[in-house]
């Protein structure tokens, strides 16, 4: 069940009509533009908040050159490449379109999502123009997360999308949280998430300055009070997930507690 998210255009339509000018008096074009921009920003922030309440996972992708072109080249239609990326992911089974999913048509409004989750890398003014593409999904198990992590654009395209951030909802209050009371799959996810977070936190020295090799070490570490049981399917899946994150350089973990939303977030470390 897939939808393509966008904020409501009703307010935008109103702002374009003469009634707006009549209602608010003699305002300049600059003032009208500023107000329109502010309202659109609030609409997007509200929409992101709605999706964070509704879905238990979000994924951010950003663009990288593959040696054949530049992102700033105006000949590339990035919305079309984003749509092709989604189609390719679904056709290859990396994106399960049978799960509740929403793909944001437009590029991410970075600071809006950053304010929703308290993510500094999105609210930093220097990052305001960095282009991310975003999808929200309600995943049901660790293998679904692994599929999302492993899927990137094919290398033969001029500019391609690459995984940058993955967020997992661990908020007990969220109706679609990975920790809920919705059956066997929810129980599996609850066990998986409840294992990932302490595993990172117990490795506190690594947690503060994580990198590729340290995350792999955490994933492989068996010297715990409760050893990682290789025969336990879910724990084995968690080990594989952490290894996949490390392979993709997604080695900056954090836990947000902002506005009632608790998310375990992994972000690609800057080189």
From Swiss-Prot:
Signal peptide residue numbers: none
Subcellular location: Mitochondrion
A cellular component annotation (GO) from this entry: mitochondrion
GO biological process: cytochrome complex assembly; mRNA processing; mRNA stabilization; rRNA processing
Keyword rRNA processing applies: yes
Keywords, alphabetical: Mitochondrion, mRNA processing, Ribosome biogenesis, rRNA processing
Function of the molecule: Involved in 5'-end processing of mitochondrial COB, 15S rRNA, and RPM1 transcript. May also have a role in 3'-end processing of the COB pre-mRNA.
Name of the protein: Cytochrome b termination protein 1
Lineage, highest ranks first: Eukaryota, Fungi, Dikarya, Ascomycota, Saccharomycotina
């Amino acid at each position: 069940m897939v939808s393509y998210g966008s904020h409501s255009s009703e307010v935008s339509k109103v702002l374009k009509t003469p009634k707006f000018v009549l209602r608010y008096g003699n305002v300049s074009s600059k003032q009208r533009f500023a107000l329109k921009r502010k309202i659109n920003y609030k609409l997007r922030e509200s929409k992101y908040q709605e999706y964070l309440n509704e879905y238990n996972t979000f994924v951010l992708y950003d663009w990288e050159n593959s040696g054949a072109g530049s992102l700033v080249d105006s000949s590339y239609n990035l919305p079309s490449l984003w749509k092709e990326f989604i189609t390719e992911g679904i056709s290859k089974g990396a994106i399960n379109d049978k799960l509740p999913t929403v793909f944001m048509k437009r590029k991410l409004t970075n600071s809006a999502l950053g304010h929703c989750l308290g993510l500094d890398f999105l609210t930093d003014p220097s990052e305001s123009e960095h282009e991310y593409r975003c999808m929200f999904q309600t995943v049901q198990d660790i293998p679904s997360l692994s599929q999302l992590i492993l899927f990137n654009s094919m290398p033969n395209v001029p500019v391609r999308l690459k995984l940058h951030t993955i967020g997992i909802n661990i908020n007990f209050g969220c109706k679609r949280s990975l920790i809920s009371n919705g059956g066997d799959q929810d129980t599996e996810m609850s066990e998986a998430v409840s294992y990932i977070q302490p595993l990172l936190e117990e490795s506190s020295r690594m947690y503060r300055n994580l990198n590729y090799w340290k995350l792999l070490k955490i994933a492989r570490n068996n010297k715990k009070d409760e050893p990682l049981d290789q025969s336990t399917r879910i724990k084995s899946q968690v080990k594989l997930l952490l290894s996949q994150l490390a392979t993709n350089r997604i080695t900056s973990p954090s836990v947000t507690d902002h506005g009632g939303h608790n998310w375990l977030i992994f972000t690609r470390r800057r080189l």
